[in-house]
């Protein structure tokens, strides 16, 4: 056998001698054949011994002798013709001492065949016997006192089919008629697969939360709630209070209306200028001067698209709903006498405003501040006496007048929470007045940098609230002296404990106010002026990546 004709079995042993490997394989095959022959010879020998009944002598310790009785070894082998002859397999029965070989093969059958033969031999029980056996078993199980309810079983009628043999015509009445009430109720139920799965409200982490940019630290409630004064645009000249239209829904007011607010340069909202035709420029003020021709900017709330089924406009049910009345009812409760008294107080304020500076400084600590507060309380509603927009640029819920006298009572919907927030507003207006005190500008008809002068816009600091000043230089000196006096009043009144307030019976902030630490955090953000990237105090959401929140690369508030 030459090396060229032999093919190696594997790549590993290609270098080995192929002839030698082939010879090794031949040797292995011969060894296996020899083993098989020895095994067959052993089986033949055992069969011959069993047939002769000679017990082989085993070598014991004493030498060759008869050993103890060995158990008989039975080799169960598979029949050569497959399982066809398995019914006639002879079971090995324990050998008896007398006749081991004379056992008839016919008696040895499987147990199942034995039982079948026994059943065939017995006659079938009659109906009476079966009834008696049933009664005995029932008495044994249920007791002798058991009496069955002999109810008539309705025969189920055959259900008529429709033209298509696959669909059944089945109505509720048919079901009740055929199957009874309970079973038909179960049958008419929808299967569990058709039940729609519950919608999971997963928050949308792709957008940062809205930034808190107001310096007052006021809790702005859930996004669907009306937070600031709505913009009431009168279409006709309204002669009486009853012709005005109010929003009476105190729980949810839509944020689609445009809202006039004051704003700073740090806010990131959209401000839409409106032409003068949308606003009644000849609205009658209570003082008779219709100077309302400044261009007014309106805050348009950014429209929020509902993503992932987030209900933006639902009220927050973790807090009780507010129990205050809508604004329309508050105004309708005012009678004519109160309105007349309010107009008289406003005329008195106008007379005191034109006094020389010495008298003005003497009077302003007493009765004038109280009248100013009452005027502020009335004018905080933008609907009063026509749309007096020049006077009321502050939203009502966010402004707290200084309570300096014993007769000053807070306006409705105000409580201690507003007084605490007012300390920030007072400081901001003081700083603004200190910056612009030496400049002494007259108001121009156009806003500068898209922003109003904040100099006279607060009701606390100047009774000339938002109107143009076209008086003599003496009036401007009066204004500068009065600013210093008012600043001292602000410091005294804001840091005094306010003891004249009645116990709080109404909830001015719609869904409760935040705890003190949240207020402090928001005030700290507003005072630092750091850009609120939405990451919050604890950093971004742990499951967020920086690519989903690109604003996080800026300096984060500490």
UniProtKB/Swiss-Prot annotation:
Composition skew (Basic and acidic residues), residue ranges: 69-81, 117-131
Single GO biological process annotation from the record: negative regulation of protein localization to centrosome
Gene Ontology CC: one annotated term: chromosome
Residue numbers spanned by region Disordered: 50-132, 205-241, 374-558
Result of knocking out the encoding gene: Temperature-sensitive with embryonic lethality at 25 degrees Celsius. RNAi-mediated knockdown results in 10% embryonic lethality at 20 degrees Celsius and 90% embryonic lethality at 25 degrees Celsius due to cell division and cytokinesis defects including centrosome duplication and attachment defects, and failed bipolar spindle formation in embryos. RNAi-mediated knockdown in a zyg-20 (it25) mutant background results in suppression of the embryonic lethality phenotype in the zyg-1 single mutant at 24 degrees Celsius.
PTM comment text: Phosphorylated. May be dephosphorylated by let-92.
Keyword Lyase tagged: no
Keywords: Cell cycle, Cell division, Chromosome, Cytoplasm, Cytoskeleton, Nucleus, Phosphoprotein, RNA-binding
Function per UniProt: RNA binding protein that is required for normal cell division and cytokinesis during embryonic development. Functions with RNA-binding protein atx-2 to ensure embryonic cell division, and to this end, plays a role in the regulation of centrosome assembly, position and size, and in astral microtubule outgrowth and nucleation. Furthermore, negatively regulates the levels of the protein kinase zyg-1 at the centrosome. Also involved in ensuring centrosome attachment to the nuclear envelope.
Subunit-level organization: Interacts (via C-terminus) with atx-2 (via C-terminus); the interaction is RNA independent. Interacts with let-92.
Protein name: Suppressor of zyg-1 protein 20
Annotated organism of origin: Caenorhabditis elegans
Gene: szy-20
């Amino acid at each position: 056998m030459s090396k060229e004709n032999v093919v190696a079995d594997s790549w590993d042993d290609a270098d080995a001698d192929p002839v030698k490997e082939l010879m090794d394989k031949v040797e292995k095959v011969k060894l296996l054949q020899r083993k098989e022959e020895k095994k067959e010879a052993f089986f033949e020998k055992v069969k011959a011994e069993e047939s002769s009944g000679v017990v082989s002598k085993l070598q014991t310790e004493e030498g060759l002798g008869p050993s103890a009785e060995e158990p008989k070894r039975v080799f169960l082998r598979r029949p050569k013709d497959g399982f066809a002859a398995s019914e006639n397999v002879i079971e090995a029965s324990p050998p008896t001492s007398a006749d081991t070989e004379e056992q008839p093969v016919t008696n040895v059958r499987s147990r199942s065949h034995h039982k079948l033969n026994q059943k065939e031999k017995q006659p079938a029980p009659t109906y009476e016997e079966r009834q008696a056996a049933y009664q005995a078993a029932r008495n044994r199980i249920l007791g002798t006192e058991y009496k069955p309810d002999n109810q008539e079983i309705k025969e189920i009628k055959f259900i008529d089919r429709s033209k298509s043999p696959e669909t059944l015509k089945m109505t509720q009445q048919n079901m009740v008629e055929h199957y009874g009430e309970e079973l038909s109720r179960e049958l008419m139920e929808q299967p569990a697969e058709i039940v729609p799965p519950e919608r999971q409200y997963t928050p949308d982490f792709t957008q940062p939360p809205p930034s808190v940019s107001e310096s007052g630290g006021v809790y702005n409630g859930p996004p669907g709630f009306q937070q600031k004064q709505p913009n009431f645009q009168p279409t006709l000249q309204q002669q009486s209070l009853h012709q005005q239209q109010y929003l009476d829904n105190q729980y949810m007011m839509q944020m689609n209306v445009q809202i006039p607010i004051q704003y700073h340069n740090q806010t990131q909202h959209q401000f839409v200028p409106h032409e003068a035709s949308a606003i009644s420029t000849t609205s009658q003020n209570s003082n008779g001067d219709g100077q309302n021709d400044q261009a007014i900017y309106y805050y348009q709330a950014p429209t929020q698209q509902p993503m992932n089924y987030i209900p933006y406009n639902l009220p927050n049910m973790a807090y009780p709903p507010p129990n205050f009345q809508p604004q329309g009812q508050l105004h309708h409760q005012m009678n004519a006498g109160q309105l007349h008294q309010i107009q008289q107080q406003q005329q008195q304020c106008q007379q005191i405003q034109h006094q020389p500076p010495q008298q003005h400084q003497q009077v302003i600590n007493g009765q004038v501040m109280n009248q100013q507060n009452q005027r502020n309380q009335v004018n905080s509603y933008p609907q009063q006496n026509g749309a007096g927009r020049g006077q009321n640029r502050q939203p009502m819920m966010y402004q707290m007048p200084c309570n300096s006298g014993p007769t000053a009572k807070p306006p409705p919907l105000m409580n201690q929470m507003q007084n605490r927030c007012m300390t920030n507003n007072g400081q901001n207006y003081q700083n603004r007045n200190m910056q612009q005190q030496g400049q002494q500008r007259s108001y121009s008809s156009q806003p500068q940098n898209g922003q109003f002068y904040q100099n006279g816009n607060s009701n606390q600091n100047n009774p000339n609230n938002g109107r143009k000043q076209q008086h003599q230089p003496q009036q401007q000196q009066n204004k500068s002296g009065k600013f210093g006096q008012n600043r001292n009043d602000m410091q005294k009144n804001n840091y005094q404990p306010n003891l004249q307030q009645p116990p709080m019976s109404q909830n001015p902030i719609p869904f409760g106010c935040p705890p003190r630490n949240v207020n402090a955090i928001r005030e700290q953000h507003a005072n630092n002026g750091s850009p609120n990237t939405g990451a919050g105090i604890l950093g971004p959401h742990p499951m967020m990546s920086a690519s989903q929140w690109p604003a996080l690369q800026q300096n984060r508030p500490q």
